[in-house]
């Protein structure tokens, strides 16, 4: 039985991994392109038209990526995927938020900015963030601890998208190591 339907924009880091996340924690998540014919109720259910957006068979609705990820993990069989301790869970949420806001904003400005000036400013911001991230990963195997958590999976998704847009990670060896290791996680491999 389907645990939830999640409306997504396909081929984006915020949505592509949610079905695989659900599978990993023992839940069947159906993802639907929010612009498809199958999504006829999307606008009625979610008038702000923002994705991802989750709805369960009993009508529970949830928006915002971090809330959706935490809900799926908490309802699944592997709650430790968000961290085992209060500190790990808080740190994991911190990194999810960092990537979902700071990094996505800079990357989006670089990839889709309306003019060259904004694209260059966004690129400089993204490169500064990559330096910060690389330094952090020089002291920690993953973002929160030595276990892959949801923030690591989401970060991998964002880095993969950045590579598709031509971002060169060769100056960030710890980011390259990180992406190589996380690419082997079942959530990524089952996408």
Curated annotation (Swiss-Prot):
GO BP term, pick one: translational elongation
Domain of life: Eukaryota
Entry's Gene Ontology molecular function annotations: glutathione transferase activity
Gene Ontology, cellular component aspect: cytoplasm; nucleus
Its biological purpose: Conjugation of reduced glutathione to a wide number of exogenous and endogenous hydrophobic electrophiles.
InterPro entries named in the record: EF-GSTs (IPR050802), Glutathione-S-Trfase_C-like (IPR010987), Glutathione-S-Trfase_C_sf (IPR036282), Glutathione_S-Trfase (IPR040079), Glutathione_S-Trfase_N (IPR004045), GST_C (IPR004046), Thioredoxin-like_sf (IPR036249)
Top enzyme class: transferase
PANTHER family with a match to the protein in the record: ELONGATION FACTOR 1-GAMMA
Residues in GST C-terminal domain copies: 85-191
Name the UniProt record assigns to this protein: Glutathione S-transferase Y-2
Keyword Magnesium set for record: no
Pfam families per record: GST_C, GST_N
UniProt keyword terms in alphabetical order: Transferase
Substrates-to-products reaction catalysed: RX + glutathione = an S-substituted glutathione + a halide anion + H(+)
